[in-house]
Amino acid sequence: MIGLTRPQLDLTDFPAVRQKFREQRPQLVLHCAALSRSPACQESPACARKLNIEVTDCLAELAAAIPFLLFSSDLVFDGRKGDYDENAPPNPLSVYAETKIAAEQIVRANPKHTVLRLSLNGGASPAGDRGFNEEMRLAWQAGRTFKLFTDEFRCPMPAVVTARAVWELAALNQPGLYHLAGSERLSRWQIGQLIASRWPQLHPRIEPVSLREYPGAPRPADTSLNCAKVRRLLSFPLPGLSEWLNANPHEPF
């Protein structure tokens, strides 16, 4: 497996990407690179389109004859309904969501390729700044209060579980569109409470707020995902976050 970081390869340098592809000749591509911070996408839509759409187009073209898995997002939905399955029509509320839908369309045009829509993922990243759990700890270390929505609902999942599921799906080689998320629908505030149960020092630094108080671009209220389709393929059940935390007290999170 070859995992390329940004210093190793600028994905917007398409000649360099093509050269690297020719050198490595991969048999499978997992495309999880993106500009994924929604506020950053709102501020720099051209950059978001470059990274999220044009890069995907380049990689999907290079991988036309091999399995290709794009990591997409539950945020492609408007959040009015919740419990979205793969047949539910997307309705983006943000630049980020618009770019992910466009990337999905590129990938799904090839019947060999797969789109995985994920929810929040947490865990231990190399730099300690990627997962929602790490964002909370960084805010605490900086002395900031971390505001968590009581009326925004997601289906969070530990990244280690997502990784296991992705490898199983890649091995099965059944292309298509799949939702892959935890089995527990939780508000951001509930998620924060669960994380603070492991890191008690966070409690004074988390504050419940409503989406109505958010000044930025509209946020979908309930993007919980129905994952029945992918569960039928996997060899293990997708856990809820509270279940996983209780069962894995020593796993980093």
Language-model features: where?
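NAD(P)-cofactor binding segment of oxidoreductase domains
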Residues: 43-69, 104-106
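Conserved Rossmann-fold NAD(P)-dependent oxidoreductase catalytic core, especially the SDR/UDP-sugar
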Residues: 57-91
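Active-site helix of classical SDR
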Residues: 99
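Amphipathic terminal alpha-helices
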Residues: 239-253
